């Protein structure tokens, strides 16, 4: 939720949803690349000519292109679409290209995601929703956006108050990870009931339900991957 820029220039742009999903898939993709490497027989290894390229595992992009199916909260991501796949590959490469940041993501996940997972399981909601917190705030608990959103779940003041968070000059429960998590999950359930899709619920969480409803009405589609949405939401 860090600085929304409304451009509306390209259809079918992929959103933070892809970034959310790829955080789950990165380790699997990397292991797949290693597992697919040609096996070396130690008995004949010394008899073979040295060819580093022949023994090298497939590139990351080669491993990525083997992925044929991907989903978010049980909803299929259309990886057969070139724009979707290209955005997925771009976001993954950008994430892995910044190794210090990628390491920080992994460390923060160990600290925060288990609690979110437990709450989602208790509420019988999709586990993938935990990655919205990563996309919203990079799991930085005291982060504040230019627009005034605060905390790991990036609640705006009015939205936070509407979902039971105490926000005044002395207390700001948006900074309280546990309390804000409960509020965020309740809000996501409400958005799913309103829009009937977790992809749309994730978009509405980022840009606001009124904004998404207006875009759906204006563009005459409720297909998440066809909607032209704010850059940050996409």
Question: What do these predicted ranges mean?
Answer:
Residues 79-234:
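Catalytic glycan-binding domains that act on GlcNAc-containing polysaccharides
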Residues 2-4, 13-14, 22-124:
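An acidic, Gly/Ser/Thr/Pro-rich helix-cap/linker signature
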